[in-house]
């Protein structure tokens, strides 16, 4: 399954297949839960009144802060990229319960909230691309487009979207209980990073639907996120 849903890379210009302007849109498709490793979880958690689980983790983002400043790149963009990269290596991120069905995707997107020209906020889905330069180009183009048009950019019909919210001006540890009964997507939230003498840390909360993944998968993702931050390079 992991091979069939892995993000494919374009052979030209080192761009990801799904980021290439001439790539074919791949939509989500329904799959039989009984034919997946999530069969038991689907049966146990789909009708649960509160199927969401929240984990907290304190990340060392010292390298990310330095990388951002040295290369003139936005910290939030780099966080979104590392989140997408870590998630793309875990097959459970290509599944999502939607309504009463289990859907499978071939790509991942990372959502970010954008302050728009009307003084409100809009939602912007960013297609994950392994190429950091391409992801940055998409980030700058799409967030600017959304900010000016005040129109959400939605990829939920073609990609499994990881929601994020960065409250970078505020000192918070995370959030729990964000379940509307409509959206089951995994969601991350963080506030201001904290500086000390030796490192800079950022506490994040990660909420996920128990049908989609178990605690071990979520923990592996968060550990993977730290590794992606530590190994980030152009």
Where are these regions (language model features)?
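Short, positively charged and aromatic/hydrophobic N-terminal segments
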Residues: 11, 17-18, 24
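Short amphipathic alpha-helices and their capping loops
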Residues: 25-48, 109-115
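Gly/Ser/Thr-rich phosphate-binding loops and adjoining beta-strand/alpha-helix segments
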Residues: 31, 46-78, 94-110, 162-164, ...
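Acyl-group handling in specialized metabolite and lipid biosynthesis
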Residues: 52-57, 64-70, 121-133, 213
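Acyl activation and transfer enzymes in specialized metabolism, enriched
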Residues: 64-89, 202-221
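Helical lid/core segments from catalytic subdomains that handle acyl or acyl-like groups
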Residues: 116-172
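Histidine-centered acyl-transfer/condensation active-site motif
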Residues: 157-171, 186-223
């Amino acid at each position: 399954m992991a091979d069939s849903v892995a993000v494919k890379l374009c052979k030209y210009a080192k761009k990801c297949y799904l980021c290439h302007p001439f790539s074919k849109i791949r939509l989500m498709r329904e799959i039989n839960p009984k034919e997946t490793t999530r069969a038991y979880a689907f049966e146990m958690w789909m009708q649960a009144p509160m199927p969401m689980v929240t984990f907290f983790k304190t990340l060392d983002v010292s390298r990310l802060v330095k990388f951002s400043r040295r290369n003139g790149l936005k910290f939030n963009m780099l966080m979104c990229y590392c989140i997408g990269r870590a998630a793309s290596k875990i097959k459970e991120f290509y599944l999502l319960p939607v309504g009463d069905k289990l859907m499978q995707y071939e790509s991942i997107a990372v959502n970010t909230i954008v302050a728009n020209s009307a003084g409100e906020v809009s939602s912007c889905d960013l297609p994950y691309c392994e190429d950091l330069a391409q992801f940055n180009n998409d980030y700058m183009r799409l967030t600017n487009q959304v900010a000016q048009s005040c129109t959400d950019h939605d990829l939920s019909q073609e990609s499994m979207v990881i929601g994020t919210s960065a409250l970078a001006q505020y000192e918070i540890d995370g959030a729990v209980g964000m379940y509307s009964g409509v959206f089951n997507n995994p969601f991350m939230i963080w506030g201001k990073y904290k500086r000390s003498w030796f490192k800079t840390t950022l506490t994040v909360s990660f909420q996920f639907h128990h049908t989609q993944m178990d605690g071990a998968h979520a923990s592996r993702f968060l550990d993977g996120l730290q590794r992606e931050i530590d190994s980030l390079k152009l």
